[in-house]
Amino acid sequence: MRVRDFLENGFHLVAGDGGLENPIEGVYICDLLSWVMAKSKPKNAWITIQSHVNIVAVALMVEQSCIIVSEGVEVEREAVERANEEAMPILSFPGTSYEAAIKLYQLLSK
């Protein structure tokens, strides 16, 4: 599965369209950036409610496939700009992180 596949299933692209072909092998859900850096794995879709520019730096450091900002949280302009520069996809999801995780589980289990 690739980031692009999520766009047809309730997720909306906010930034980083240069990374839409990134492969996704798993999902990680966390809002504490230091915890994500320590525990997440490369090629994960990272679900968070954080929306500031530092999420892009963390996602790049851990080699995430994309960032999914749940709860309909608006992503800050600086984060959008940085994600576009780095080709790190940021997707939005209107539901809870739990609902996003269920949706991703269903998609990745196909």
How would you name each of these model-derived features?
Residues D5-V27:
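An N-cap/entry alpha-helix motif that binds or orients negatively charged groups
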Residues C30:
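Active-site rim beta-loop-alpha module in soluble metabolic enzymes
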